[in-house]
Every structure is written in C-alpha cells, then in structure tokens.
C-alpha cells in the first residue's frame, strides 16, 4: 500500500497514470479512480490524497515547494529518489504515474482555470494523446536543455487535455473559449491576442475579418 498527502497548493498539477490504478481523493469531493492512460488535472489550493486505494492512509506529505516529509513531519526514513526525476519506493512498483506541477500561472491561464472544477479527469479513450509516451521517454533523460524540453512537452499535454475536456458536451466551456471557433469572432480575437498594443476598433476588426461593421457588431 502507498499514499501521498498533497498539500503543495500548486496552481495547476497534471497527473497521468502509466501503470496500475491510482486514486485521487479530494478533501471536498468524491474519490476518483485513474487507470493506465487516464489523466487528471487539479488546480487551486485544495488538498487531496493520491493512493493505491481510497482507504490507504498516506505515509508521505507533500508541502509547497514540493517539500516531502513522512507522516509525522520528519524527513522520509528511506531515500525516495530512484534516478533522474524519478521518485518513489520501488522503481518496479505496481503503480507508476507522471506528475507535472505549475508553480505560477498567468492571468489568462487563471481565467481559463476558473472555468474548470477543482479536480477533473479524462479516460484514456477520451483523449488519445501521443505526447505521453514521448514525455515518459524524456523525463528520465538529463541532457542539455532537458528542462526546456520537458516544460514544452508538459504545456502540449495540458493543451491537449483542455481541448479534449472542453469538447465534451457537459464541460460548460466559457463563451470566450467557444468563440475561438467562430470564423469571424475567432479571427478578431486572434488579431487582438497577436497584437494587443494596436488600437483596435470595430471598423478595423471588421475590415480584417472581411465583414461589414454592422455584421461584426
């Protein structure tokens, strides 16, 4: 049995299961079972437990800054490092997962995350993402520039997850997100995002979108 008590309060954490079953048990929510290929996203300051079973008592506490302690607040009794960016009590264990945490988010990202529940997940057949195997291969490497490689891969996994999530009919995607798919409004939004310093007006946006001002308004 194994369990992690997560009180890191990272703005955003992405967890993908590689092997075995993993349970996420939020303090204020229902337990969530993840199987190989499933992915979960947590955000905000909520605390939760990650374990092999909802009833397993956590033996490791993770605090802000990814600081790890045993259940009694002491340093873990046994070294938990299993190699490059690999952490746990058994490299051949029955449960293996990839975890990436964002420690800072932009205002735009925060606006997007406010549209999401605190904990959400997608099953493997809901988001066929070819990036996860690549991330599995890259995370154990220690080559020059590897941090930049992993950061970009994690960004891509996050974008793929959010696209798949908001494509669900029950996702409740915010209006500004769905507007991106509109051929006229979406083009205008992209223009303003690309050049926010430009003094855009209804007339100039309508002209760039190849529609009349009345149609655009």
Model-flagged regions — what are they?
Residues 156, 160-166, 181-182, 187-217:
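Basic/polar phosphate-binding segments, predominantly the helix-turn-helix DNA-binding elements
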Residues 20, 53, 138-141, 195:
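Generic structural signal for alpha-helix termini and adjacent loop/cap motifs
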Residues 72-156, 160-165, 169, 173, ...:
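Amphipathic alpha-helical segments enriched in hydrophobic/aromatic residues interleaved with Lys/Arg
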Residues 2-113, 117:
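N-terminal regulatory/effector-sensing and dimerization cores
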Residues 2, 170-176, 217:
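Short, Lys/Arg-enriched N-terminal segment that forms or immediately precedes the first helix
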Residues 1-2, 23, 87, 165, ...:
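Tryptophan-centered motif/residue detector
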Residues 9-12, 152, 156-157, 183:
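Aromatic- and histidine-enriched alpha-helix N-cap/loop-to-helix transition segments
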Residues 126, 178-183:
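Short helix-capping and inter-helix turn/linker motifs at the boundaries of alpha-helical repeat units
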């Amino acid at each position: 049995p194994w369990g992690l008590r997560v009180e890191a309060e990272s703005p955003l954490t992405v967890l993908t299961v590689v092997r075995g079953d993993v349970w996420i048990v939020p303090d204020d929510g229902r337990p969530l079972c993840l199987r190989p290929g499933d992915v979960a996203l947590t955000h905000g300051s909520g605390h939760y437990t990650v374990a092999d079973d909802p009833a397993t008592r956590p033996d490791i506490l993770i605090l802000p800054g990814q600081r790890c302690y045993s259940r009694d607040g002491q340093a873990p009794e046994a070294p938990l490092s299993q190699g490059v960016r690999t952490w746990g009590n058994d490299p051949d264990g029955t449960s293996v997962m990839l975890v990436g945490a964002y420690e800072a988010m932009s205002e735009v990202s925060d606006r997007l995350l406010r549209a999401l529940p605190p904990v959400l997940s997608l099953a493997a057949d809901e988001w066929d993402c070819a990036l996860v195997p690549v991330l599995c291969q890259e995370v154990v490497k220690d080559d020059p520039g590897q941090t930049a490689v992993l950061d970009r891969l994690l960004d891509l996994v996050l974008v793929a997850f959010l696209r798949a999530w908001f494509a669900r009919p029950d996702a409740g995607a915010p209006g500004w997100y769905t507007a991106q798919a509109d051929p006229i409004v979406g083009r205008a939004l992209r223009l303003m995002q690309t050049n926010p310093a430009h003094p855009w007006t209804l007339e100039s946006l309508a002209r760039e979108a190849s529609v009349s001002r009345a149609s655009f308004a």
